[in-house]
Regions:
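Flexible phosphate-sensing "switch/lid" loops adjacent to ATP/NTP-binding sites
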Residues: 2-7, 12, 17-28, 32-210, ...
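C-terminal lobe/tail of nucleotide-utilizing enzymes
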Residues: 200-334
Length: 334
């Protein structure tokens, strides 16, 4: 299974390009899932599906075309499906502090839960082979980096803290629960954590395997956006992932000759030259600005035709080496 991550600064067009890529893959006969791992989902909106996913109230993949499936992780559903014991304990703690009802349940949704739920699905599909390609519409850069670092972070916790914490709680729980109003986590809480870790086991290896996972960084021909893309490029490499394309979205097309856009074009040309120079030898693709919003299957198909050549496979493996590698030297990396 191929995993394609579309990441970049918020507002650069990640969702539209991920959706267009998924359409092209499905048209080529590949069973494709496009999944949003952004807490502020807009993937269904990009396909102009209206309230289809909202009305379905599901976290499961929804078929939206031949060989094409869409998934937006619904964290409230995931809490019941995968986080039962953890959610129940955290909710009980908040209720002890005075929060009741919906407020306590909402506060029990901890940072990272949505990303970890998405990671579990990716690993599930990798193991089952249900899809040939999974296209991930990532959150803005910082959240995307947290997503790819989750397996390493959780592995460290499981190796160095979890066992000790679990044993300590088992020993002191009978006494502590009698003395204070806040109960210590039950054994089911720790078993739930162990089950979650088991569900993502091995996904870090898949993410670092360039024959499985590729990162596509989306940027605009703007200096501020470029700087964040440069940082993301280094950070993804630091985490062991391979960036195989830089995609510059919303480039002014040649037919725009109005004088109002002259200075914008000059700035874009200067930034495009800097992009080519900085990211070489990683291929840089340019996608023109369209005169209308890229919304719905027809326009996304049109977008795909500008992003990929006719007959080109977006899932093809084009790079297997990372431009940056890092090695630890004492207390720093080189």
């Amino acid at each position: 299974m191929r995993i394609l991550l579309y990441s970049g600064k918020g507002g650069v067009g990640k969702t539209s390009l991920a959706a267009a890529t998924a359409i092209r893959l499905a048209q080529m006969g590949k069973r494709t899932l496009v999944m949003s791992i952004d807490p502020a989902h807009s993937l269904a909106d990009s396909f102009d599906l209206g309230g289809a996913l909202f009305e379905a109230q599901t976290s499961d993949p929804l078929q939206i075309g031949p060989q094409l499936f869409l998934q937006e992780v619904n964290i409230n559903r995931e809490m019941k499906r995968h986080w039962g014991a953890i959610s129940a304990y955290v909710t009980s703690v908040f209720r002890t502090s005075g929060l009741e009802g919906v407020e306590a349940e909402e506060m029990a949704i901890l940072p990272g839960m949505e990303e970890l739920s998405a990671m579990m699905y990716v690993n599930q599909y990798r193991r089952s082979g249900e899809f040939e390609v999974v296209v991930l519409d990532c959150a803005p850069t910082a959240e995307s980096l947290r997503f790819v670092s989750l397996p390493t972070t959780l592995e460290w916790y499981m190796k160095h803290v979890f066992g000790l914490e679990r044993s300590l709680m088992k020993a002191v729980r009978p006494i502590a629960n009698r003395l204070g109003p806040v109960k210590l986590p039950p054994e089911s809480y720790f078993q739930n954590v162990q089950d979650l870790f088991d569900k993502i086991a091995g996904v870090d290896t898949a993410l670092e395997d360039s024959s499985v996972t590729s990162v596509r960084l989306i940027t605009n021909a703007e200096k501020m956006v470029l700087r964040e893309t440069q940082r993301a490029f280094v950070y993804f490499s630091l985490h062991g992932l391979t960036v195989d394309h830089i995609i510059v979205n919303r480039v002014l097309p040649d037919e725009v000759q109005d004088g109002f856009f002259r200075s914008i074009r000059e700035e874009q040309n200067a930034t495009l030259a800097a992009i080519e120079q900085y990211f070489a030898p990683v291929p840089v693709r340019r996608v023109p600005m369209f005169p209308n919003e890229m919304l719905g299957f027809d326009r996304l198909t049109q977008l795909a035709s500008k992003l990929y050549a006719e007959g080109e496979d977006p899932a093809a493996i084009t790079r297997v080496t990372r431009p940056f590698t890092f090695a630890r030297d004492g207390d720093h990396y080189e």
